[in-house]
């Protein structure tokens, strides 16, 4: 009898242990996905979140994470689908629903569905208290719908709620993307009237002057930021020097940035590659881009990969540039500049094929050197 009882107790304990182990594994998978998302490893994060969804672990949260990963990877319709699935789950908290609606509106905007995005923005406005970020999102959606007055009203609300350098720059960039820089410049001018308080403020002021193409003031503000310990200011100073065609000074700034920065080195290598391209040293540019890609997270890769296309094009290696551009467009399908680059490369390759027709059947082919020797 005692043996049987002990056996039953052992069976229960083993079963509980197995259940705990299974739950622990699911928890670890989810936590690792969260870490990957925070670190910019979006493909790994997506895999982890999808595993969590399949295992019915934190389903709404996992669908949210998968949606964010897809959004960062450029799969905008996939992101919309994930956020929609998350919203359809039982017992989604009100705060999470707000978060999901905002993310879905962002994905819909990027997927070219501004009407759907505006519907979610209107739901947010009716069901929740609006904040600066939601006003800004609604302004971006209105801008995409050519509803300029509505966009302006929402941007004003956003800036009223959060009158800082970051918001001023975001509004400017939103207008700039639509070729309406003048509408955004007034926000830059407004924030420049505030007094800087620390190195970060001076750095942001320098960035703003750079956008306004006031390079002397940009240098002054960024130099102050650097003197106060801002490493980011060194990279921005490199951008300013490049804009002034001073590649030697720019190269020095980017090298100083690489020497001072411990983690985000990709930005420095990208800067050196830009200096190389400006100087016509395309092979060196490709070497620096390769170094940058090794150090880059997903967010930093885009500019490096685009500049890799440019370097191959400048080398007149149009076939490699075209192949790289095709890969790039799969990753960043909404990049209009890259789309134009791809079309140019396609036409350039077609032009080369017309200029160099294939030999007729049965015709011998010979190199230029062989032809020269025959003629001699």
Question: For the regions a protein language model found, what residue spans apply to each?
Answer:
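C-terminal motif of bacterial Sec signal peptides marking the signal peptidase cleavage site
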Residues: 18-21
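Start-of-helix register in tetratricopeptide repeats
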Residues: 27-28, 61, 95-99, 133, ...
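Register position in tetratricopeptide repeats
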Residues: 38-39, 72, 110, 144-145, ...
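Short coil turns that delineate tetratricopeptide repeat
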Residues: 57, 91, 95, 129, ...
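Canonical tetratricopeptide repeat
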Residues: 65, 72, 99-103, 136-137, ...
């Amino acid at each position: 009898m005692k043996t049987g009882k002990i056996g039953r107790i052992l069976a229960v304990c083993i079963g509980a242990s197995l259940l705990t182990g299974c739950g622990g594994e699911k928890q670890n998978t989810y936590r690792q996905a969260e870490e990957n998302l925070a670190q910019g490893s979006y493909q790994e994060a997506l895999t982890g979140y999808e595993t969590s969804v399949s295992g019915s672990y934190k389903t709404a949260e996992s669908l949210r994470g998968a949606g964010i990963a897809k959004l960062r990877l450029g799969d905008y319709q996939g992101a919309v689908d994930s956020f929609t699935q998350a919203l359809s789950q039982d017992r989604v908290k009100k705060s999470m629903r707000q978060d999901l609606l905002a993310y879905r509106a962002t994905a819909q905007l990027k997927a070219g569905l501004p009407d759907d995005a505006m519907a979610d923005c209107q739901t947010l406005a009716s069901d929740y208290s609006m904040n600066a970020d939601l006003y800004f999102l609604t302004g971006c959606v209105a801008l995409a719908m050519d509803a300029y007055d509505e966009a302006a009203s929402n941007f004003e609300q956003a800036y009223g709620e959060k009158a800082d350098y970051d918001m001023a720059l975001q509004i400017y960039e939103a207008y700039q993307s639509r070729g309406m820089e003048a509408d955004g410049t007034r926000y830059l001018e407004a924030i420049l009237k505030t007094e800087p308080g620390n190195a970060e403020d001076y750095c942001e002021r320098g960035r703003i002057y750079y956008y306004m193409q006031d390079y002397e003031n940009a240098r002054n503000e960024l130099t102050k930021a650097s003197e106060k310990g801002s490493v980011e200011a060194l990279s921005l100073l490199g951008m300013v020097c490049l804009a002034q065609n001073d590649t030697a000074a720019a190269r020095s700034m980017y090298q100083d940035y690489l020497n001072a920065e411990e983690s985000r080195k990709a930005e420095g290598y990208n800067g050196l590659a830009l200096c190389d391209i400006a100087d016509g040293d395309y092979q060196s540019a490709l070497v620096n881009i390769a170094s940058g890609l090794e150090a880059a997270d997903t967010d930093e890769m885009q500019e490096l990969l685009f500049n890799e296309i440019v370097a191959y094009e400048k080398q007149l290696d149009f076939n490699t540039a075209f192949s790289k551009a095709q890969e790039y467009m799969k990753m960043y399908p909404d990049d209009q500049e890259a789309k134009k680059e791809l079309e140019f490369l396609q036409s350039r390759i077609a032009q080369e094929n017309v200029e160099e027709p294939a030999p007729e059947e049965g015709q011998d082919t010979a190199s230029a050197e062989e032809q020269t020797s025959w003629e001699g």
